[in-house]
Amino acid sequence: MTKRAIVLLSGGLDSATVLAMAKAQGFETYALSMRYGQRHSSELDAAKQVASALGAVRHEIVDLDLRRFGGSALTDDKLDVPTGGASSGIPITYVPARNTIMLSLALGWAEAVGGRDLFFGANAVDYSGYPDCRPEYVAAYETLANLATKAGVEGDRFHVHAPIIDMTKAEIIRAGIRLGVDYSMTVSCYKADDDGRACGVCDSCRIRRAGFEAAGVPDPTRYQNA
């Protein structure tokens, strides 16, 4: 019997690794990305490349403009993307309810295609301030998924997977390399240019660069100032 999984795919390092993990577990993968009003589209271009390279059966990009709401440095140009390293509290790069919105889209698609597994790249190590990247959030969403769907109510349970939630960036990179992920395709930068070149100074770039250093792996990221 074919096992189908919906994998949230941003085009970044973490979600690319999770897509490879789902495939390695024998799932037929369906990749889901969202054009939510983020500062650049190069991560979605990266998502297309990654989905193709890692053999996703289908890749969908859903349009849902969260810029209408704002509330995040990633969707509101009036807010600056931080470059000074991690701070206490919830980072301003948190997009209100983004993971919940995307998981709900994934849940609907999964039920439609007969999939019962959702994968996403939540990580509590690098971004412990994000409320929707905690283990208790993952467990709570799985409970919701099984209360809110026909399949769940009838006992055909959904499972929500966050396989990198307790991994360091170096561990994620090493795992991805073992699975054949080409990280040169991925875009993690909050301020990447139209060609996908990273700024090198935002917090996401800093964490990514440090991860490659800690993993002892050459950094394939293309930087704007290189």
From Swiss-Prot:
GO terms for biological process: queuosine biosynthetic process. Its cofactor is Zn(2+). Pathway: Purine metabolism; 7-cyano-7-deazaguanine biosynthesis. Keywords: ATP-binding, Ligase, Metal-binding, Nucleotide-binding, Queuosine biosynthesis, Zinc. Disulfide bonds: none annotated. The keyword Transit peptide does not apply. NCBIfam families: 7-cyano-7-deazaguanine synthase QueC. Catalyzes the ATP-dependent conversion of 7-carboxy-7-deazaguanine (CDG) to 7-cyano-7-deazaguanine (preQ(0)). This is 7-cyano-7-deazaguanine synthase.
